[in-house]
Structure formats: C-alpha cells, structure tokens
C-alpha cells in the first residue's frame, strides 16, 4: 500500500519502519532462509540510501548520500521516476487537474510525461559531465523545479483528503492482520533471523505482502463467506 503501508508499519513496529532499511534487511538477513546474500558494500549502500523522502536529493554533504556514482544514479532516478509517474497517475485519477500544476514548473520541466523525463535525465547527464563525474549532479534550475514538483505532490496528492481516507483503510487492514499474525506466529512467522523477537519477524511477513495478497488474506480471515442459495 505504498507510503500508507510504510506509515502504518512504522507505528506498529517498536523500532519503526522504512522501506530502504527493510530492503537491506531482506538481502542481509532474510534471503536464503536467513543466511542472506553475499552482496558487496557498494550494492548494500546503494539499497539503503536509494530513497530520500522529502530530504535532499543530491546534496554532496548529506550523510545519507550513496557512496558510489551508481548509487547516486539510483537515488536521482528514483525521484525522476516517481514524481513523473505520480503526477500522471493523479491527473488520470482526477485528484488534480492540469491547470493545478504550477505554470512555472510546466515552463521549466515541460507539460508531458516524456518531455519532463527527457529534460530531467539530460540535465543530470550534462551537469554530472560538467562536474567531471566526481558526483552525480543536477543544475540548480532543474533541481529547484524537481523539489517544487515533489512538494506539490506531497501537498496536493500524498496528503490530500482522498489519500487520508486510503490511509485509514490501510491502517485497518494492516493493523488487523498484524494483530492476527501476532496471536498465532507459528502459522505465519518464519523462525529466522534467530534471536529477533516475534514482533519484528511479524513485520517481515506483513512487509513482504503484495497489496493483493494482503486484501485476500484479510478477506479470508475477517470477512464472512457468502452462503450458497439453495
């Protein structure tokens, strides 16, 4: 359930929840029946630092900046992908209208999906080359526009009334499933990593669900079955 699911798990788990940290946990502690994958530092660093929420996208002084150019490319690609797809999804869903998008952003980034992506990607290439490829960069003009577009999405899409309604539904589904699993961990929770409390391993189980699986399990566990008509 996207950000809503992440927020809900963050409230349920004693140490909170962030999808990037959970991704690292999966490859280090959960894969291969708890043995983990033998990944290099560079790959693990890129996984853990690929996401930045509302923080700096490519601040060279930021403590959470990926250590490698490849990791920095993943980080900026993540932003380019989700701001473009989310703005289009919000338009198609009727959450916002084209005229709601600030004219200044349209002027800098373009009106159409392909135009925006092309402009952002080419700017990253040109700014990074201009800096001698010491780090992945964006020009100040495009960076300001991307940050403004991201903030527009937070204010008008992610935190709008429809999103809050979906959050309440998500909290209900995930919260009920989490409580159900905690009552019978032997049925759902894996026995590894050894030493991790059941509540953390229950979080692993919930976090590993797809939306469809979670809704199907919720229906099977909590909703009554229809009676056949004789």
Regions found by a protein language model. Give the residues of each.
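Aspartate-rich (DDxxD/NDxxD/DxxxD) Mg2+/diphosphate-binding motifs
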Residues: 1-20
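Histidine-centered, transition-metal-coordinating active-site segments
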Residues: 17, 21, 26-34, 38-230
């Amino acid at each position: 359930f996207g950000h809503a699911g992440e927020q809900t798990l963050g409230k349920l788990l004693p140490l909170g929840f962030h999808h990037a940290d959970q991704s690292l946990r999966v490859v280090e502690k959960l894969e291969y029946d708890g043995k983990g994958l033998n990944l290099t530092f560079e790959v693990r660093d890129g996984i853990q630092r690929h996401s930045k929420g509302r923080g700096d996208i490519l601040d060279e002084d930021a403590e959470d900046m990926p250590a490698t150019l490849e990791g920095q490319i993943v980080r900026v690609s993540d932003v380019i992908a989700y701001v473009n797809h989310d703005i289009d999804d919000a338009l198609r869903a009727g959450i916002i209208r084209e005229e709601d998008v600030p004219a200044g952003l349209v002027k800098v980034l373009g009106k159409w999906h392909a135009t925006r992506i092309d402009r952002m990607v080419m700017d990253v290439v040109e700014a990074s080359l201009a800096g001698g490829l010491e780090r992945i960069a964006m020009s100040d003009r495009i960076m300001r526009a991307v940050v403004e577009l991201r903030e527009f999405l937070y204010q008008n899409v992610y935190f709008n009334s429809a999103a809050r309604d979906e959050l309440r539904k998500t909290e209900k589904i995930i919260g009920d499933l989490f409580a159900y699993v905690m009552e019978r961990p032997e049925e759902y929770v894996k026995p590894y990593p050894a030493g991790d409390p059941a509540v953390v391993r229950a979080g692993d189980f919930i976090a590993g669900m797809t939306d469809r699986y979670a809704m199907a399990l919720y229906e099977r566990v909590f909703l009554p079955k229809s009676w056949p008509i004789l």
